[in-house]
Amino acid sequence: MTFEPQMPNWGLIEFEQHKEKLVNYHDWLYTTGIKTGLISKKPKQFIWDEFIVHSLYFHHLIKKYNFKSKEIYDLGTGGGIPGVPISIVNKRKVNLIDNKKTRIYEL
């Protein structure tokens, strides 16, 4: 079965503008993220739908409610979810915070 990333209408513009980086992060989660224990073993489509798309919905809300000037903190980031996808499409600093140093070093 071939993995093909898809995006709901609310995220199509950002997806098209940042597709390569988002897919690269997805692939990193699927390989390194699973291997190092940042995320549990999941199918590629699940990782895309549940981690990437859901993360980008936060970006959609940031735009919708005009929170662009606010600082963003991802508490308990684990594998960088939702912080990394948000920072990819938002092109701004997202503070990734986790209580396990190994997770932060891996990111």
Predicted regions and their residues:
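Class I SAM-dependent transferase core
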Residues: 2-3, 7-67, 73, 105
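Conserved SAM/SAH cofactor-binding pocket of Class I
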Residues: 56-107
